[in-house]
């Protein structure tokens, strides 16, 4: 059996230029992933690898100005990037079989699930933990969101 890994995942996504132009069928879809970034940690939380790829958007090809300002990702950064199915397959291969995904906040996993469904892909994935929620509950002793800063 392969060694266990924690995959600390950070996604960036584009949104429609106008909320009224968001895709509504087969479900409301307003967050198209344009970057997957991750660190792999071993069982002792030592960094053992990193992964980063831009993703060429299919559904929202024009970059939302607010997204550009927040992420500093420009349209030209995405022009030669793989589309989501290839990028996600590469990411999952990099993750390996014996891992869990960790995020900081409640948004990344639902956005990832929506993108898998929009691309007609299998939405099965490793176990997932929202570290922000765990930190708030266990360390801060409340459910308020905490910034990493």
Per-segment meaning from a language model:
Residues 27, 77-80, 141:
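Alpha-helix initiation/capping motif
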């Amino acid at each position: 059996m392969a060694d266990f890994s924690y995959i600390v995942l950070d996604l960036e996504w584009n949104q429609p230029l106008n909320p009224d132009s968001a895709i509504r069928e087969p479900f409301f879809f307003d967050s198209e992933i344009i970057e997957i970034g991750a660190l792999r940690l071993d069982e002792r939380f030592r960094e053992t690898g990193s992964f980063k790829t831009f993703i060429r958007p299919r559904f929202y090809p024009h970059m939302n100005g607010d997204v550009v300002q927040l992420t500093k990702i420009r349209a030209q950064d995405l022009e030669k990037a793989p589309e989501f199915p290839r990028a996600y397959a590469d990411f999952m291969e990099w993750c390996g079989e014996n891992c869990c995904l960790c995020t900081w906040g409640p948004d990344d996993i639902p956005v990832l699930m929506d993108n898998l469904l929009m691309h007609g892909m299998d939405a099965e994935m490793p176990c997932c933990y929202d570290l922000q929620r765990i930190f708030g509950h266990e360390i801060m002793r409340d459910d308020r969101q905490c910034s990493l800063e």
